[in-house]
């Protein structure tokens, strides 16, 4: 373990839920405009996660008014108010960059079924 890893451990957040590529998430982001602050919700599916520790990021994509919008969020950033997992997706890849070229029904992600036990 490096010296910086022990320093970074102090800044890691512990309120981040488990989510993976293909999951639909709502990211509540704190937006500060002048003197006012508000929370903006960005809902989309996770295209991938990369990095580790403080430097870990994830990419969320949504289609807004027919135009694809992607945002990259640092997982442990203080501008993120909270992350909600809406649905779990069933995908076979760690990075879903191929979804950029899909439109309509081809862009759907199967929902992971709960175990029937």
Swiss-Prot record:
It comes from the Bacteria. GO terms for biological process: translation. One of its GO terms (cellular component) is cytosolic large ribosomal subunit. Keywords: Ribonucleoprotein, Ribosomal protein. One of its GO terms (molecular function) is structural constituent of ribosome. Belongs to the bacterial ribosomal protein bL19 family. This protein is located at the 30S-50S ribosomal subunit interface and may play a role in the structure and function of the aminoacyl-tRNA binding site. HAMAP family: Ribosomal_bL19. This is Large ribosomal subunit protein bL19.
């Amino acid at each position: 373990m490096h010296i910086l890893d022990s320093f970074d451990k102090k800044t890691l957040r512990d309120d981040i839920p488990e989510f993976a590529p293909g999951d639909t998430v709502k990211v509540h982001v704190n937006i500060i405009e002048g003197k006012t602050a508000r929370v903006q919700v960005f809902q989309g599916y996770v295209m991938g996660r990369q990095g580790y520790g403080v430097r870990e990021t994830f990419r969320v994509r949504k289609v807004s008014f027919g135009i694809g919008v992607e945002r990259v969020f640092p997982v442990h950033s203080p501008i993120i108010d909270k992350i909600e997992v809406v649905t779990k997706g069933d995908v076979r890849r760690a990075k879903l960059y191929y979804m950029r070229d899909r439109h309509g029904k081809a862009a759907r992600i199967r929902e992971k079924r709960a175990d029937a036990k």
